[in-house]
């Protein structure tokens, strides 16, 4: 039973933020689509787990010190994770007829990002210290989870702009990945040499 309490502690911050974003939409999205987007966000771990070992092998051979931390922060973590989140929005959410205003992208962006973050949080809370840890759940509730939510806001808004502002659609689509990668990478890199980096990055 106590394992479920740790899992609840891991996913609750993400769920609360998704609900908060959902309630900010003046014309709410279908809950079923938002929920599926959250689940697809969780499922991005399948693609991410295929790519990460390849990048790990590459980085061990070519990078040391700060260059390793830079690669690890901006490419291995930020780019890979944000790319797969963007795929959920582009190939699932934007094809729904309910996706008809910029705020919709924000809601779906938060849902996809926090779907991934919730799954990642479960792994951190249950396994990172060798035993379940509420301390890690609390720490990440104020660090990694809000980061993923913010990246989702930016990504979702810019993907919306790429659809509804046709003159700059390719630029907005590029920025929808580039800016969240920069935010995510800077966050990870800023903690790269600290004692808590393995808990919150």
Language-model features: where?
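Hydrophobic alpha-helical segments at protein termini of multi-pass membrane proteins
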Residues: 1-201
């Amino acid at each position: 039973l106590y394992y479920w309490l740790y899992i609840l502690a891991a996913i609750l911050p993400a769920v609360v933020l998704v609900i908060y974003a959902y309630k900010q939409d003046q014309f709410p999205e279908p809950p079923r689509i938002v929920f599926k987007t959250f689940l697809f966000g969780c499922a991005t771990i399948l693609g991410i787990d295929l790519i990460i070992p390849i990048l790990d092998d590459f980085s061990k051979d070519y990078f040391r010190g700060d260059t390793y931390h830079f690669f690890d922060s901006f490419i291995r973590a930020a780019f890979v994770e944000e790319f797969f989140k963007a795929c959920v929005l582009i190939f699932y959410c934007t094809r729904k007829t309910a996706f008809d205003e910029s705020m919709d992208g924000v809601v779906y962006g938060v849902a996809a990002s926090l779907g991934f973050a919730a799954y990642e949080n479960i792994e951190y809370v249950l396994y990172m210290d060798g035993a379940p840890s509420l301390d890690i759940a609390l720490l990440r509730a104020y660090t990694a989870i809000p980061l993923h939510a913010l990246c989702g806001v930016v990504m979702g808004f810019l993907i919306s702009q790429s659809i509804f502002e046709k003159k700059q659609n390719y630029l907005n689509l590029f920025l929808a990945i580039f800016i969240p990668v920069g935010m995510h990478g800077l966050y990870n890199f800023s903690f790269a040499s600290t004692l808590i980096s393995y808990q919150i990055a």
